[in-house]
C-alpha cells in the first residue's frame, strides 16, 4: 500500500516539476524583453533569460530550494523586480497603463517632479526612470516605469505603540499631501501601502516571498523598526485623479460608487455618488481599523493591545455618513494632539495580538521591558523617525 502511495506522490511531484519548467503567460512579456531591458541597464532574474534552463533539472535537490522554482511567476502581471546594473540595487518595473486607460503616468510623474518631489510630506512612490518600449503591447501599453523596490508595510511585526504611531503619522501625512494637491488616490487600501526595505533588512527580501532573501540564499532577517526606522509609501495610481482646484472649491467632485479594492465603503453599498476624498479617508481609516483595532480574521488580521487611543478618530474616519468624516487636514491635527498625550511608557508598550491570552502577554512583558531598556540606553526614540541616508538622491 505504501509503495502505491509513494508512486502516486512521485508521479504528482514529477508532473508539477514539469509544469513549473514552463513560463506562465504573465511572464512571457518579461522574457521577450530581457535583452532590451538589459541594454537599458536593468537585469531581470535568471528565470526570464531567453535561454533559461530550470536550475533544478538534473539535480536531486528539492526544487523549492531553487529561486527560479520557488518564485516562479510575478504576483502582478505588469510588475516585476529587476537589478539596476549601474549600482546593483533592486528596483521595481511597472508596465504602465496607457493614458487612454488611466491617469497612472500623469499622477506618477506629477508626484515625482518639481516641488512635489522634494516635499517631506510626499509619501508617494517616486519614478526613477521611464523606458519607451520599441513596440506597444497588444493592449496599448508602451512604456515601463522604474520605481523603488518596496515591500508590504505589514510584513514585519510592530513591536511597540510608538512604531504604530509612526506608521499612522506617515500615512496620514501622505494622504493629506495628496489631498492638498487635489489628488484623490481612489484606492487607499492595505496593499497599496508599502515601505522601504533597506532600513529593516540587511539583504533585500524577495518580492514573491519576503521571508526569503532576494538571492534565495537564505531567510530574510528583518530588524526592529525602533532601531531602524522606515519610510512608508503609497503606490498604484491607476484609479487616481487630480481635480481642478476651482471645481473642488465651489462644489464637491463626485464619482460613481464601486471603484477600488475596499468594498466595505458605506456609500458603495447605498449605490450613491461618492466624494472621492471622503472615500479616501474611509479607506485609510479602515486599514488601521482592520489591522490594529478590530481586526479582520478573514485576512488573518487580529486586534492589538494598547491601541485604544486611536479608536475614536478611526471611528470618525470610517463613519457611515461621509459628510461627518474629518478631512485629512483634520485627521493629521487630531492625531498629533492624541500622540502628544501618550507617555513614554505607553509609547514603548507592546502591541501584542489579542488572540493570545493576557497571561501570555504579561509573561512576555519582562523580556519586552528589557529590550525597551536597551533602546532607551541607546537613546533610541520611542516614536521612530526615519532620516533619509545622504546618498538617497534619486537618479534623474
List where the protein language model places each region.
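Regulatory extensions appended to serine/threonine kinase catalytic cores
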Residues: 10, 344-396
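ATP-binding glycine-rich loop module of kinase domains
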Residues: 37-134
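Conserved structural core of kinase catalytic domains
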Residues: 112, 116-171, 198, 204
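Conserved hydrophobic alpha-helix
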Residues: 171-178, 317
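Protein kinase subdomain VIII
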Residues: 212-222, 236-273, 278, 285
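Conserved C-terminal C-lobe helix
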Residues: 304-320
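Terminal C-lobe "cap" of eukaryotic-type protein kinase domains
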Residues: 319-345
Amino acid at each position: 500500500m505504501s509503495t502505491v502511495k509513494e508512486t502516486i506522490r512521485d508521479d504528482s511531484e514529477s508532473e508539477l516539476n514539469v509544469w513549473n519548467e514552463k513560463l506562465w503567460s504573465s511572464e512571457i512579456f518579461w522574457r521577450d524583453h530581457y535583452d532590451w531591458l538589459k541594454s537599458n541597464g536593468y537585469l531581470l532574474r535568471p528565470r526570464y533569460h531567453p535561454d533559461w534552463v530550470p536550475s533544478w533539472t538534473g539535480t536531486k535537490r528539492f526544487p523549492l530550494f531553487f529561486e527560479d522554482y520557488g518564485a516562479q511567476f510575478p504576483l502582478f502581471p505588469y510588475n516585476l523586480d529587476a537589478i539596476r546594473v549601474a549600482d546593483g540595487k533592486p528596483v521595481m518595473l511597472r508596465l504602465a497603463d496607457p493614458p487612454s486607460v488611466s491617469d497612472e503616468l500623469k499622477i506618477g510623474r506629477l508626484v515625482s517632479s518639481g516641488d512635489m518631489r522634494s516635499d517631506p510630506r510626499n509619501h508617494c512612490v517616486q519614478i526613477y526612470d521611464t523606458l519607451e518600449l520599441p513596440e506597444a503591447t497588444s493592449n496599448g501599453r508602451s512604456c515601463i516605469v522604474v520605481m523603488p523596490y518596496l515591500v508590504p508595510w505589514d510584513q514585519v511585526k510592530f513591536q511597540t505603540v510608538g512604531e504604530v504611531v509612526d506608521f499612522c503619522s506617515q500615512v496620514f501625512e501622505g494622504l493629506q499631501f495628496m489631498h492638498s494637491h487635489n489628488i484623490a488616490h481612489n484606492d487607499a487600501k492595505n496593499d497599496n501601502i508599502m515601505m522601504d526595505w533597506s532600513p529593516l533588512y540587511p539583504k533585500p527580501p524577495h518580492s514573491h516571498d519576503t521571508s526569503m532573501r532576494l538571492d534565495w540564499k537564505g531567510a530574510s532577517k528583518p530588524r526592529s523598526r525602533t532601531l531602524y526606522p522606515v519610510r512608508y509609501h503609497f503606490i498604484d495610481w491607476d484609479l487616481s485623479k487630480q481635480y481642478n482646484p476651482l471645481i473642488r472649491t465651489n462644489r464637491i467632485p463626485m464619482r460613481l460608487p464601486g471603484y477600488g479594492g475596499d468594498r466595505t465603503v458605506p456609500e458603495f453599498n447605498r449605490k450613491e455618488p461618492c466624494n472621492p476624498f471622503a472615500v479616501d479617508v474611509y479607506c485609510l481609516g479602515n486599514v488601521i481599523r482592520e489591522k490594529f483595532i478590530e481586526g479582520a480574521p478573514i485576512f488573518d488580521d487580529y486586534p492589538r493591545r494598547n491601541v485604544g487611543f486611536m479608536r475614536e478618530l478611526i471611528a470618525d474616519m470610517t463613519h457611515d455618513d461621509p459628510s461627518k468624516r474629518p478631512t485629512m487636514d483634520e485627521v493629521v491635527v487630531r492625531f498629533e494632539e492624541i500622540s502628544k498625550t501618550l507617555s513614554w511608557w505607553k509609547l514603548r508598550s507592546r502591541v501584542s495580538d489579542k488572540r493570545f491570552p493576557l497571561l501570555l502577554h504579561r509573561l512576555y512583558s519582562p523580556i519586552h521591558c528589557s529590550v525597551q531598556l536597551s533602546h532607551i540606553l541607546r537613546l533610541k526614540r520611542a516614536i521612530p523617525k526615519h532620516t533619509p541616508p545622504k546618498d538617497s538622491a534619486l537618479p534623474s
